[in-house]
Every structure is written in structure tokens, then in C-alpha cells.
From Swiss-Prot:
Anything else known: The active site is a conserved redox-active cysteine residue, the peroxidatic cysteine (C(P)), which makes the nucleophilic attack on the peroxide substrate. The peroxide oxidizes the C(P)-SH to cysteine sulfenic acid (C(P)-SOH), which then reacts with another cysteine residue, the resolving cysteine (C(R)), to form a disulfide bridge. The disulfide is subsequently reduced by an appropriate electron donor to complete the catalytic cycle. In this typical 2-Cys peroxiredoxin, C(R) is provided by the other dimeric subunit to form an intersubunit disulfide.
Highest taxon of source: Eukaryota
GO biological process, one term: cell redox homeostasis
Upper classification of the organism: Eukaryota, Viridiplantae, Streptophyta, Embryophyta, Tracheophyta
Statement: the UniProt record of this protein carries the keyword Disulfide bond: yes
Species of provenance: Hordeum vulgare (Barley)
Biological role stated in the UniProt entry: Thiol-specific peroxidase that catalyzes the reduction of hydrogen peroxide and organic hydroperoxides to water and alcohols, respectively. Plays a role in cell protection against oxidative stress by detoxifying peroxides. May be an antioxidant enzyme particularly in the developing shoot and photosynthesizing leaf.
Protein's recorded name: 2-Cys peroxiredoxin BAS1, chloroplastic
Length: 210
């Protein structure tokens, strides 16, 4: 979409975008979870859990349910490594609830294992730099936020491109692994594979072993 591409090109100049390595913008909003309305505040997770925060354009669309249900189906894997998932769109909680109450075979979500946050004011999408102003919807932004509330990873896809749960999980596992002192993860690293020390000797040892 040309308008989305134009937005991305000028976004850095128009917004104070959250950067990897900086604190995530806090927010408080209504959400739907377990077919109930709840309140969610991002800072409530500080000191407790990692957060996968992902934005999607709209409820009752086409690519969006494939992503949302894929994350729900793999929720237990994220839960095991102390991580919560939050989905966000500019829809109301009433729209979220109706979508959750619609069966998957009819284009709905069915029961989800994590909250869907309502960003009707568009303030959350704007604060994370994913809002397309002239369309009033969010690009497919995904942010991994650590237990200190710091953004450790971000990706933004255009509207027609879904995201990979496998790659999100792999990246999260790598981020948690490198919390160990003096360890870094090479390309495509997965748990159980060899990492390296971030110095000339360590890199030589790594390359000699592969």
C-alpha cells in the first residue's frame, strides 16, 4: 500500500519513535480476555514477565486472525518462559468480544489464551510508531519487552504480510539467553545450540567448532 510506505518513510521525522534499548511507552487500556472486559497496564508486567506486544490493523479481517490464533495456539510455549502476549488494534472491546465469540471456521478467533487490547483512541499505536495516520489503523508492529520494561526487539510489517510465531519465539529465547554475561547468539541460534563469547578468542573458538 503506497500510503503505508509513505508513512514509514516519514515516521522517524514525525514521531518520537520508541527505539530498541529504550523503555517501552507505558499505557493503560481496556482489553478482552476469557470473554470478559479487563484493564491492562503495560507497566504492571515490569519485574514480572517479558511481553510480546503485537499490533494488527483491524478485527474481522483476513491475515489478522491467522496471526492471532497462531500466537494463541502456541501460548503455552511463551508462558513456560515467563512471557505474556498482548494483541492490540484500534477496535473497541465490543468488537474484540464479538470476534472472540465467533468460531474460527466462520472467520472468528474462538477462545484466546491472551488479552486483546482496545486502542480506540489510537494513542498506543501512535506511541509505538505504528499508526498510519490517514487510515487510522496500525501496521503489523511487534515488540519484545523485557522484565525491566525495555524494548529488546521490534519488527514492523506492511499490512499484507503476516508474522512468524516460530521466529518470534526464537528471538525471545535468544534475548533471554544473552542475559547471561559474556554470551551472544549467532544467526539462527536456537536453544541448545552453540553460542559465542563476544571477543576475538571467543569468535575463533565458535567458528572452529562449526
Amino acid at each position: 500500500d503506497a500510503r503505508a510506505r509513505s508513512f514509514v518513510a516519514r515516521a522517524a521525522a514525525e514521531y518520537d519513535l520508541p527505539l530498541v534499548g529504550n523503555k517501552a511507552p507505558d499505557f493503560a487500556a481496556e482489553a478482552v480476555f476469557d470473554q470478559e472486559f479487563i484493564n491492562v497496564k503495560l507497566s504492571d508486567y515490569i519485574g514480572k514477565k517479558y511481553v510480546i506486544l503485537f499490533f494488527y490493523p483491524l478485527d474481522f479481517t483476513f491475515v489478522c486472525p491467522t496471526e492471532i490464533t497462531a500466537f494463541s495456539d502456541r501460548h503455552e510455549e511463551f508462558e513456560k518462559i515467563n512471557t505474556e502476549i498482548l494483541g492490540v488494534s484500534v477496535d473497541s472491546v465490543f468488537s474484540h468480544l464479538a470476534w472472540v465469540q465467533t468460531e474460527r471456521k466462520s472467520g472468528g478467533l474462538g477462545d484466546l489464551k491472551y488479552p486483546l487490547v482496545s486502542d480506540v483512541t489510537k494513542s498506543i499505536s501512535k506511541s509505538f510508531g505504528v499508526l498510519i495516520p490517514d487510515q487510522g489503523i496500525a501496521l503489523r508492529g511487534l515488540f519484545i519487552i523485557d522484565k525491566e520494561g525495555v524494548i529488546q526487539h521490534s519488527t514492523i510489517n506492511n499490512l499484507g504480510i503476516g508474522r512468524s510465531v516460530d521466529e518470534t519465539l526464537r528471538t525471545l529465547q535468544a534475548l533471554q539467553y544473552v542475559k547471561k554475561p559474556d554470551e551472544v547468539c549467532p544467526a539462527g541460534w536456537k536453544p541448545g545450540e552453540k553460542s559465542m563469547k563476544p571477543d576475538p578468542k571467543g569468535s575463533k573458538e565458535y567458528f572452529a567448532a562449526i
